[in-house]
C-alpha cells in the first residue's frame, strides 16, 4: 500500500480575468467522508478547498495556443498523481491528448461516445486544436454525430477532482466534464443548440494503468507502444443518460466508462491499429485494450483485466498461451447480424482469460447489436464502435449476461491526410 501523498499545487497557467463559466459546481457528496467506493485509494490534497484559489492547478489555453519553436514537452510515464490532469503543458505542435467518455444502454441498442481533445493533429479536420466529438447511436439504428472546435479549453485539478470545459462563447456552446479525485464518478454536461443534457457514470472498478496495474501504483506504467500512453480512470460502471437531441429526449441507463489517451506524436504516427472491449455483466467488469505500433514492426501491447465485485481476479499483458504465466487470447468473431461498412466485417469477440497457476479459466463472448460510430479513412479501413451484448464467466461456474462496447481502429497505409510527424 502506498503512503498517502499530499500534493501542494501551484498555478500552471493563469486564467483569464474572469473565472471559467462552469456549468455546475462540484457535487456536494464528493465532500462527504467515506463517499468513495474505494476509500483507501490515494486522494490528492490541495492547499485549499476546490475553487479558483491557489489550491487548484489550472490549465487554460486558447484554440491555437502552443509552445513556440521545437520545444520538447515531457510528461510522466507512471500511474501516480492525477490521471485526469493535462499531460502536455504547454501543448506543442506534435503531441496531443484526449479525455474520452462512453456508454451503452442496458439493452445494448443505444450508445454514446464523447471525445474532449487538445490535439493540433486534428486541425486538418477543422479549426484549431481544441476538438469535441459527440456521437450517439439510437435503437432505431440511426446515429447522431457532431464535431465542435472550441475557442478555449480550461482544465482545473483541485482536491475534490478534475473538471474540464471546452467552450465557444461566440457560438454559444460549451461542453464539460467533472471526475472526482478517486476517479469513481464522472459527470458530463452538454450544452449546444442541438444537444443538451447531463450524464453520470459511477464506477464499479478501480482505475487502471496500461500494464494492468490499479491506480495508484508507484511502478505502474502508462506506456503502451512507443510514444503512446493510456490509462482507464473508469474501466466500467453504471451510467445514467439524460439528454435532449434536437428536441427529442434520450433517457436510459446502462454501462459507462472513461479513458485517457496522450501521445508524443499523432495517433497515426505512433499507431497502426487498436482494439478494445469494455464489458459489464453480473459481478464482472472486463477491460481489454490492444495497440499495434506503426513505428516498430510486429510490436503489440495488450492489457486484459477482470474485476469481480470490484476486486481484480485476473490481469495479464500476455496475448499468447503459456503453461506457467497468466494470458488472454482475444479472437474476432464473424457471421453475426450486426457489422459496419468497413472491409473487416467483424461481428464480435471471444476472450479467453487463463491463469495456469491459479487454475482459473474465464470465457467471455461479445456480440455486436448496433453501430455506435464509424469513420471511413480510406483503403477500406477506419474506426468503428459497436454497442453489444456480453455473456460469460468462469468455466464450469455461473454464467452471466450484460452489455459491452467494442472499438476498432486501423489507419490506411497511404493517405495524404495521415502523414507521420515523427521528429
Curated annotation (Swiss-Prot):
InterPro entries linked to this entry: DA_C
Documented EC number(s): 5.5.1.-
Keywords tagged on the record: Glycoprotein, Isomerase, Signal
Annotated coiled-coil segments of the chain: none
Bridged cysteine pairs (disulfide): none
Function per UniProt: Diels-Alderase; part of the gene cluster that mediates the biosynthesis of the mycotoxin pyrichalasin H, a tyrosine-derived cytochalasan that inhibits the growth of rice seedlings, but also inhibits lymphocyte capping and actin polymerization and alters cell morphology. Pyrichalasin H is indicated as the responsible agent for the genus-specific pathogenicity of M.grisea toward crabgrass. The first step in the pathway is catalyzed by the O-methyltransferase pyiA which methylates free tyrosine to generate the precursor O-methyltyrosine.
Stated name of the protein: Diels-Alderase pyiF
Protein species of origin: Pyricularia grisea
Gene that specifies this protein: pyiF
Amino acid at each position: 500500500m502506498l503512503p498517502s501523498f499530499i500534493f501542494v499545487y501551484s498555478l500552471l497557467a493563469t486564467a483569464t480575468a474572469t473565472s471559467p463559466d462552469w456549468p455546475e459546481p462540484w457535487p456536494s457528496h464528493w465532500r462527504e467522508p467515506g463517499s468513495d467506493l474505494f476509500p483507501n485509494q490515494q486522494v490528492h490534497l490541495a492547499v485549499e478547498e476546490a475553487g479558483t484559489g491557489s489550491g487548484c492547478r489550472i490549465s487554460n489555453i486558447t484554440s491555437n495556443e502552443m509552445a513556440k519553436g521545437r520545444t520538447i514537452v515531457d510528461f510522466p510515464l507512471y500511474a501516480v498523481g492525477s490521471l485526469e490532469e493535462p499531460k502536455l503543458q504547454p501543448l506543442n505542435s506534435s503531441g496531443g491528448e484526449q479525455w474520452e467518455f462512453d456508454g451503452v444502454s442496458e439493452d445494448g441498442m443505444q450508445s454514446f461516445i464523447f471525445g474532449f481533445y487538445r490535439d493540433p493533429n486534428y486541425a486538418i479536420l477543422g479549426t484549431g486544436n481544441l476538438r469535441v466529438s459527440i456521437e450517439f447511436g439510437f435503437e432505431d439504428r440511426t446515429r447522431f454525430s457532431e464535431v465542435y472546435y472550441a475557442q478555449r479549453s480550461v482544465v482545473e485539478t483541485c482536491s475534490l477532482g478534475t473538471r474540464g470545459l471546452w467552450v465557444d462563447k461566440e457560438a454559444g456552446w460549451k461542453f464539460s466534464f467533472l471526475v472526482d479525485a478517486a476517479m469513481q464518478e464522472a459527470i458530463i454536461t452538454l450544452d449546444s443548440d442541438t444537444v443538451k443534457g447531463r450524464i453520470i457514470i459511477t464506477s464499479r472498478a478501480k482505475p487502471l494503468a496500461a500494464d494492468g496495474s490499479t491506480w495508484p501504483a508507484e511502478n505502474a506504467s502508462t506506456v503502451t507502444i512507443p510514444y503512446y500512453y493510456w490509462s482507464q480512470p473508469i474501466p466500467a460502471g453504471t451510467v445514467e443518460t439524460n439528454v435532449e437531441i434536437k428536441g427529442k429526449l434520450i433517457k436510459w441507463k446502462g454501462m459507462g466508462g472513461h479513458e485517457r489517451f496522450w501521445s508524443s506524436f499523432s495517433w497515426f504516427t505512433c499507431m497502426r491499429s487498436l482494439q478494445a472491449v469494455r464489458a459489464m455483466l453480473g459481478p464482472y467488469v472486463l477491460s481489454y485494450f490492444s495497440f499495434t505500433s506503426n513505428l516498430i514492426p510486429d510490436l503489440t501491447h495488450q492489457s486484459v483485466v477482470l474485476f469481480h465485485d470490484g476486486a481484480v481476479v485476473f490481469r495479464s499483458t500476455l496475448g499468447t498461451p503459456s503453461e506457467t504465466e497468466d494470458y488472454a487470447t482475444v479472437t474476432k468473431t464473424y457471421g453475426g447480424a450486426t457489422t459496419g461498412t468497413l472491409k473487416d466485417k467483424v461481428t464480435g469477440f471471444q476472450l479467453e482469460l487463463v491463469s495456469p497457476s491459479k487454475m482459473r479459466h474465464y470465457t467471455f463472448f461479445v456480440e455486436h447489436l448496433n453501430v455506435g460510430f464509424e469513420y471511413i479513412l480510406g483503403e477500406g479501413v477506419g474506426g468503428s464502435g459497436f454497442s453489444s451484448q456480453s455473456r460469460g464467466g468462469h468455466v464450469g461456474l455461473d454464467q452471466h449476461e450484460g452489455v459491452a462496447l467494442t472499438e476498432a481502429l486501423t489507419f490506411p497505409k497511404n493517405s495524404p491526410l495521415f502523414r507521420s510527424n515523427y521528429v
